[in-house]
Amino acid sequence: MHLLQESTARSICMHGRVEWVSGSKAFGVNDSGDRLDFDWDDGPTPMQVTLQMIGICSMADVVLGLKERVFDKVWVELSAERATTTPRVFTAVHLEYHVRGDVPLNLVERIVKMSHDKYCSVSHMFNENITITHSSVLHPLSEA
């Protein structure tokens, strides 16, 4: 049984399932059947995964935005602050984008800004009380 109705002209409906296996092990499956395994004791915690998801969502925008440029590596260093009381939500997130290639820094910065202002759905899921900042670092191809 789906809790939400199927897609309409105003929204896209997404389905998934998470299932506990044993101990701290669980898995998630999306509506396409793709599976992710989790272990909150011996792997990333749900909050760590959430932080990584904002990085991967926005990094995908950067890679797609640079598709006509010469580059061979993109990564994002992530840091976050959390509230000290329950619920221990994120209060601040910083993403430092690294691009190795022959790419103008102002282009990377513009793509990153557009990602967070418009395209990255995960970034927009965060409460407006969370401060999200970002910076960009270029690395020459000779560092390969």
Enumerate the predicted regions with their spans.
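Extended beta-strand/beta-hairpin segments
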Residues: 2-53, 60-144
